[in-house]
Amino acid sequence: MSYRLFSISVKLPVLSASLLLCSASLLNAQEKPPTNDASTAAPAPWEQIRQVPMSGGLRVFWNVAGGDNTTNYREAAAHGFEMVDLLNTYSDYPGRQKENIRKTLDTNKNNPWKKPEFFERIIRRNIEQRGNQNAIFVHDIEFSFEEDIDKAWSDPTVRAASKATSREQFGDAYLREWATWFTLPCQWAKERFPGTPVGIYGPQPFRRDYYGISGKSAQQIDGTHQSDAELWKHIDPFVDYYVASIYVFYDKPDSVYYMAANVEENIERTRRYGDKPLYAYEWLRYHSSNQKLADQEVAPWLAEAMAVIPYFCGARGVALWGSEPKRQGQYYQTLPVFTKSLGRVSDLSAKLAAAKLMPDEPAHVLWKARRPLVRRMRVSADEWIILAVNPWQNEDAVSHVEVSLEKSRISVELRGRHSEIFHCRGENVTRL
């Protein structure tokens, strides 16, 4: 693939209010907001939603905007969700997009030294107007650029702009300069709001992948994602946390392993830099690029899975994103399922936060072999918390999987496609 594409857009306008209202016109064409379905029963009210307070350093974020922000922001916060300052960093809403930075990249895919003259002014203004009201600050910066360095090197204008004297020197300078399109906004946000954690929705240490993981070897996966790592090494010093986008595309067993693998692969590639937390961005609707399922809410078994899997794969939190501009009240039929599942993590969050994630077979290996996903968190020699799910079996099926602990080996029962969590203390095993 010639161009780097960060395909999920979560575009929101720059407003001085503490929270943003996401409009349909601001979304990527592949992520159109859902239309109202009058035939669908109203979702459960917030009064029937389980609270999910976190402790010990684990977190859950609410990044859903819609037609009833006042109610949903208030209720989400009361239920344990933290809020997000999400900024469409390159936008120019006051100027009706006349100085939209992203638009300049439509005709500039290979010259990172060609920033528009309004680059800094627009970004600093947007940061100021976005404000600093919430738990974390997220720059939404997504664009494609030429990944073929030889092709970029062959352009005399770009080569001259780089001032590089060799192909090798150019390669490093080229990616380093593209990185500044992401890192400068982070620097400016930190200058304006010292102490606020700043990160990026866009490039990742491991670019979100599905078919590049499914059925592939570790060597094949590394090869496909080499350019991610080369770009990220220039970005890493400027972010306080990582984002892994795991929006679901398919109502298939594979989606469980896709979520797990994308979190794990990002975690694996970031530990060389330290232990900054990773947050998994999720959506309670299928990604709109799947036209068959576009705008439908994910199946309940997937809502149950996405609520807990990231925490057992190294993530320190999940961020629930969404855009519901035409809806009032609580937006989702599946939110009760999501929070009920997440509540199991909430109840044990202090223990899980301090537990050690034990080595297990990579998710991509289990995916290829169609075996259950099992993850083990060691609290102590006598206390473990286990996640196990077999999405390949029917909803009414039951199977068993053996799990090795430090002092014993246990067999746990897996019901249908449920994401099961077991709390093991001594000889006692409790299904949560």
Language model features by range: what are they?
Residues 30-428, 432:
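Glycan-processing catalytic domains of CAZymes
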